[in-house]
From Swiss-Prot:
Binds 2 Zn(2+) ions per subunit. NCBIfam families: GSH_gloB (TIGR03413). Zn(2+) 1 binds at H54, H56, H113, D137. The gene is gloB. Monomer. It catalyses: an S-(2-hydroxyacyl)glutathione + H2O = a 2-hydroxy carboxylate + glutathione + H(+). InterPro entries: Clx_II_MBL (IPR035680), Glyoxalase_II_hydrolase (IPR050110), HAGH_C (IPR032282), Hydroxyacylglutathione_Hdrlase (IPR017782), Metallo-B-lactamas (IPR001279), RibonucZ/Hydroxyglut_hydro (IPR036866). It comes from the Bacteria. The keyword Nucleotide-binding does not apply. SMART domains: Lactamase_B (SM00849). Signal peptide: none annotated. The keyword Hydrolase applies. This is Hydroxyacylglutathione hydrolase.
Length: 257
């Protein structure tokens, strides 16, 4: 399974999954249809599935046009998003599995950004290959999503689930927010040398127009403050020794950054 990253809107990423043996494709969070249709035409591939992580328009905005072009496509989303995702046919529960070609993804319930948010995790096929995590707006490179419908406690629980995946997991998040995220992270975790090193690398990449997605989960665990709420340095920075309160205070600071 090849993952093709497509830029969309101002800072979104759409992910096209392509199986070259069957020449079929699936798409994760089509913010708009045009980049997907263009890539499918180049591949001469058939779209068989739309995997939505949540209902926000910059993740589902392309659904209807893709359905019109490929009437047999199946549209997947969380069960709690029923009525909010255009064209949704499959209503996924936590722990469900979805298949694309010869790969099977686990559905992880990750409320916080929205009340119904899910992530799709394709485990590695061999010991020396990475798993693939499509996490929408729950976990970002260097950050996490705003809490529009969920609570800090829910988001901590959701991020704990994602944090427990193998460290070589590739994190396919839906926005190019990494530079600003890491600039904020350094403001609350200023003595983190791994973070400073990563920020310097990201500055160079972005100055050259290079994408910073995917990232690796192991790197996130070392540098992303929203996965590090137990760290004494971060707790000291926000004057809290409670994990949920620490997370909430860091999130509050980020909202104003």
């Amino acid at each position: 399974m090849q993952v093709i990253r497509l830029a969309a809107l101002s800072d979104n990423y759409i992910f096209l999954l392509h199986d070259s043996h069957k020449n079929i494709a699936a798409v994760v969070d089509p913010a708009e249809a045009e980049p997907v249709l263009k890539q499918l035409a180049q591949l001469k591939a058939e779209l068989v599935a739309i995997f939505n992580t949540h209902h926000h328009n910059d993740h589902v905005g392309g659904n209807q046009k893709l359905i019109q072009k490929f009437p047999q496509v199946k549209v997947y989303g969380g069960a709690k998003d029923q009525g909010r995702i255009p064209g949704q046919q499959v209503f996924l529960q936590p722990g469900d599995r979805v298949q694309f070609a010869d790969r099977v993804a686990e559905v992880i319930f990750v409320p916080g950004h929205t009340r119904a948010h899910i992530a799709y995790y394709f485990p590695p096929q061999t010991d020396d290959t990475p798993g693939e995590l499509f996490c929408g707006d729950t976990l970002f490179a260097g950050g996490c999503g705003r809490l529009f419908e969920g609570t800090p406690a829910q988001m901590v629980e959701s991020l704990t689930k994602l944090r427990s995946l193998p460290e070589n997991t590739r994190v396919w998040c839906a926005h190019e927010y990494t530079l600003k995220n890491l600039q904020f992270a350094l403001s609350v975790d200023s003595k983190n040398t791994e973070l400073q090193k990563r920020l310097d690398e990201v500055k160079t990449k972005r100055s050259q127009g290079i994408a910073t997605v995917p990232s690796l989960l192991g790197v996130e665990k070392l540098t992303n403050p929203f996965l590090r709420w137990e760290q004494p340095s971060l707790q000291l920075a926000v004057n809290s020794n409670d994990p949920v309160q620490t997370f909430a205070r860091i999130r509050g600071l980020k909202d104003k950054f």
